[in-house]
């Protein structure tokens, strides 16, 4: 069962403006990355379903985070079917994210009052997802849909939209500012926030610093 309510999840996404996206088969690495993000000001974290037994790792992370990072909202990403969504909800996922929009997932999450953010690449997909009860829709892959102008043009007719942007997002002022100015609700960030060499070197302080910088750029762009 989710620890945080839908309103709490959405409020944290909006307030911080960033959702780190990460997976590693080594649970200790996952713990260190989550802790580093937490210390950097992150309060919403997406663990992606991208490896064998990923759900088992997630279940342990939920229990660990409850004690070590009590304000961190953990959710599951790369969820493409209703069965997988149900599995992660049982393990305590506070939100579900997918690279695609699967209308079968929406009612599973809606019954639990858990946010479902599906991947969308057009106005039609975004609108259909909203009709299915998705409060935050994920534009993915961001680097292929037309850039910040796409978001701005979507927000014109669908001005009530809450768009989470993922793909081709970097923790730099030059990259983040145009997306924030275009009106995104929050951004999802993965490999650029967690370079392989940084993780391999166990340089958790560097990840904390990157998170702090990125959150600062987002806050600045919103002013």
Report residues per predicted region.
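Conserved N-terminal beta1-alpha1 strand-loop-helix module at the mouth
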Residues: 1-75, 79-83, 87-91, 181, ...
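Hydrophobic faces of well-ordered beta-strands that scaffold small-molecule active sites
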Residues: 17-22, 45-47, 74-77, 96-97, ...
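Glycine-enriched alpha-helix->loop->beta-strand junction motifs that scaffold or abut catalytic
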Residues: 38-43, 89-96, 110-117, 131-136, ...
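Catalytic cores of alpha/beta
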Residues: 81-91, 124-133, 169-187
């Amino acid at each position: 069962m989710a620890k945080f309510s839908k309103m709490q999840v959405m409020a944290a996404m909006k307030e911080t403006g960033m959702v780190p996206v990460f997976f590693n088969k080594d649970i200790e690495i996952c713990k260190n990355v989550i802790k580093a993000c937490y210390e950097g000001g992150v309060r919403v974290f997406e663990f992606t379903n991208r490896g064998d037994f990923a759900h088992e790792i997630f279940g342990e992370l939920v229990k660990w985070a409850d004690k070590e990072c009590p304000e961190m909202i953990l959710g599951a990403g790369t969820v493409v079917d209703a069965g997988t969504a149900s599995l992660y909800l049982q393990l305590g996922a506070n939100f579900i994210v997918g690279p695609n929009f699967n209308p079968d997932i929406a009612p599973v999450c809606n019954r639990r009052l858990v946010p479902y953010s599906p991947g969308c690449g057009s106005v039609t997909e975004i609108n259909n997802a909203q009709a299915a009860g998705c409060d935050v829709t994920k534009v993915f892959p961001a680097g292929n849909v037309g850039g910040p102008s796409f978001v701005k043009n979507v927000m014109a007719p669908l001005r009530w939209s809450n768009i989470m942007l993922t793909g081709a997002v970097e923790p730099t002022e030059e990259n983040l500012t145009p997306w924030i100015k275009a009106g995104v609700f929050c951004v999802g960030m993965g490999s650029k926030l967690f370079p392989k060499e940084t993780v391999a070197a166990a340089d958790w302080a560097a990840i904390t610093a990157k998170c702090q910088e990125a959150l600062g750029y987002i806050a600045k762009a919103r002013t």
